[in-house]
């Protein structure tokens, strides 16, 4: 379970975009090719190069289970910097190719739509959830009756995607997801515990957004990776705390989860789970991002004690609650 925290524009999403770019561009054999950007909006070299250092190239290095990193070097493909060439330093291992494959790496951006009654059918078989998470409901509708990996069966009595999603959704919100497919569209409603079906815009936006996160977690196979930006969107603090409990269980089942968030409830939820011995220190990594005096990103790993305490204080990290409370109490 991984959490990226820190101020706006400090580099958190850049790391996620680097992972997605690597997923798009790493190949079995070393060599050179043009940039592929199926998962990101970065279409030319100028979009992503470091302007602070006036970079004429940049690299993404990625390794799996302690292997030597596979390095992708990106250079401009023309004098205008409008195109990009990618050169891969070495052959990629089957393990690395596996975890970066389109079936094993799923992504929910902060720009995911959420809340719509009518949802489209996905024409792209290689991008299960869509570039912006617009096809999460489509994935659910197509796979809802399929059994999940045994490790991802978190609730007894059901083994299907539909059963597990609705168990968690009911537990977190009191609703169940109902999807009807007619023609080229899916129609979404939420069912109360009394059996009444409601349109998404009648149940609160947070229900739709948490539904997408739950589906994405269950859609990721054991050994795969799910990246989600701001899973706490539109959620009450109690729901945020319950959500991190769920995501920790999915991570414990063997799914690599990467969260980008500004929520102190998720951060403190991780600390609580550590203190309750429900999350091992070896199974969690939290990084705080900041910009240094030169405008460059620095990422500091947050170290925890077995009691959920923070070993070394990092200025500015989730301290606003304490600042406000001190002001209220005039301390």
Go through the PLM ranges and name each one.
Residues 242-331:
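C-terminal lobe/lid and adjacent interdomain/linker elements of RecA-like ASCE P-loop ATPase modules
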Residues 25-216, 221-222, 295, 300-331:
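Phosphate-coordinating catalytic segments in nucleotide- and nucleic-acid-processing enzymes
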Residues 229-230:
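Walker B catalytic acidic pair
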Residues 2-43, 204-216, 246, 252, ...:
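Phosphate-binding glycine-rich loops of NTP-binding sites
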């Amino acid at each position: 379970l991984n959490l990226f925290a820190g101020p706006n524009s400090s580099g958190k999403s850049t790391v996620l975009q680097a992972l997605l770019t690597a997923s798009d561009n790493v190949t079995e054999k070393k060599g050179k090719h043009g940039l592929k950007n199926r998962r990101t909006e970065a279409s030319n070299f100028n979009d992503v190069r470091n302007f602070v250092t006036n970079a004429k190239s940049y690299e993404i290095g990625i390794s799996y289970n302690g292997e030597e990193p596979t390095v992708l070097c990106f250079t401009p493909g023309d004098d205008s910097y409008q195109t990009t060439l990618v050169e891969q330093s070495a052959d990629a291992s089957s393990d690395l190719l596996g975890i970066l494959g389109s079936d094993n790496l799923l992504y929910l951006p902060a720009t995911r739509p959420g809340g719509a009654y009518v949802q489209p059918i996905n024409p792209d078989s290689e991008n299960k959830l869509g570039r912006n998470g617009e096809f999460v409901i489509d994935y659910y509708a197509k796979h809802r009756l399929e059994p999940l990996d045994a490790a991802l069966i978190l609730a007894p009595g059901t083994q299907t995607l539909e059963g597990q999603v609705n168990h968690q959704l009911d537990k977190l919100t009191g609703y169940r997801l109902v999807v009807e497919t007619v023609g080229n569209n899916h129609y979404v409603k939420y069912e109360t515990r009394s059996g009444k079906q409601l349109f998404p815009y009648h149940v609160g936006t947070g229900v739709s957004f948490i539904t997408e996160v739950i589906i994405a977690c269950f859609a990721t196979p054991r050994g795969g990776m799910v990246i989600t930006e701001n899973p706490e969107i539109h959620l009450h603090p109690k729901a945020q705390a319950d959500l991190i409990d769920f995501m920790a269980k999915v991570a414990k089942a063997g799914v690599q989860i990467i969260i980008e968030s500004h929520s102190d409830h998720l951060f403190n939820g991780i600390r609580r789970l550590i203190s309750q011995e429900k999350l091992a220190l070896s199974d969690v990594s939290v990084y705080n991002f900041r910009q240094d005096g030169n405008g460059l990103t620095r990422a500091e790993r947050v170290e925890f004690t077995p009691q959920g305490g923070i070993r070394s204080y990092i200025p500015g990290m989730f301290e606003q609650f304490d600042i406000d409370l001190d002001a209220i109490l005039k301390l």
